[in-house]
Amino acid sequence: MKLFGTSGIRMKNLDPLIAYKVGFAISKNFKKAVIGRDTRTTGNLIESAITAGLLNGGCDVTILGIVPTPVLGFSAKSHDIGIMITASHNPPEYNGIKLFNNNGTSFTPNQEESLEEIIEKSDFLDPSWDIVGNVSEDKTAVKKYLDYILSNINIKKKFNVVVDCANAAACGISPNLFTNAGCKVISVNSHCDGRFVGRMPEPNEKNLVETVDIVKGLNLSGRDFIGIAHDGDADRMIAIDEMGRVTDFDKLLAAFCKYVVQKTNAKKIVTTVDASMAIEEYLKEFGAEVIRTKIGDVSVAYEIEKTGAIFGGEPSGTWIHKSIHLTPDGILSGLRVLEMMEFYDKRLCEIMDEVPSYINLREKLPCPDELKNKVMKYVSKEGKLLFKKEPETLDGVRFSFENGWILIRPSGTESYIRVRVEAKDETFANELLNNGISLVNNGILK
């Protein structure tokens, strides 16, 4: 039974029986679990089901209630395992389960496969009275997290910030932390509602229209508000600059990488195969190495640990700040954007305008799951002949050129193959995209 995808388990109308089985499987190897959840309407149901499975197997459970993923990851340090019930940016009918080690990192694919094997082999016997685990609540977890983050940031300037919580797990916590950091805060969509009545939890330009209007309106009088918007579990964020522009994920990541290198003299930065070449261009003058890894925060965290890098990030807004903790943290990332602005003594819009802009094109092509492996082999072989380049196969198939690159990669959650290109001019970008589409379509037909 394949349950885990690229970011834990994530399903429409997640069956509580699956959650029960996952809990029982976890109890085979872990005896102290902590559980958090986002605001989705099925959160209580899934929490109860997974708790029942854990207790049946003799695992003690600590319940945090509604908390962001970074709070859960931080709390996992005092337990054997952390369990976050969330579907992140997906619509309200979805829910999911994401697992964390007690160092704050997400479970690896190997760990997830081991759990799937246990689920396949388990008979889920009735509980025995003498091994059933205990349940407790921890009402101090959020305060411990807030105190820890505040002790690790240093912002002297009084910034004006609109914090958009998406009616999700960041509610109360993110606005509170920004306020305690000395900011003037206006919170938006900051009451918990698992129907996501204010906006859908994906923090993109389409969903942030009203928040952008609020930032623009506040800045008519020259007050220089920026916006920080979270997803469903607040492991990610995106910023809105003083001009009311939703910042490009790639450009914001490139700007922050430069800040980390300049401030700390870091020699290594970790990012993923789908991140912009602007990062290399931007860091070239500082001699910092850009290490690319597979897509997903677990791969970024692993590479950070392996290489000794102090920061790693994905162009989805998922950033990991090793000096503070290894769990992706959208609330901390928002605060560190303010640190960057203070360091340069510039408005966010000025910082963003300095980052190189390239042409980015994306296409997703329908492909049956059973054909994906065959198609990717075709893409690698024929792409090598077409582009006269060796393919990079770390995650999908990527071909890099002096003026751009193309990445062709099967989706881990949908029946699609995604094509992404980046280039310094539009003609080359369109050429790469058309070639990529042809490779995939021909691979399906072969």
UniProtKB/Swiss-Prot annotation:
GO terms for biological process: carbohydrate metabolic process. Coiled coil: none annotated. Keywords: Isomerase, Magnesium, Metal-binding, Phosphoprotein. Activated by phosphorylation. It is an enzyme of class 5 (isomerase). One of its GO terms (molecular function) is phosphoglucosamine mutase activity. The active site is at S88 (phosphoserine intermediate). Its cofactor is Mg(2+). SUPFAM superfamilies: Phosphoglucomutase, C-terminal domain (SSF55957), Phosphoglucomutase, first 3 domains (SSF53738). The keyword DNA-binding does not apply. Its EC number is 5.4.2.10. HAMAP family: GlmM_A (MF_01554_A). Belongs to the phosphohexose mutase family. Catalyzes the conversion of glucosamine-6-phosphate to glucosamine-1-phosphate. This is Phosphoglucosamine mutase.
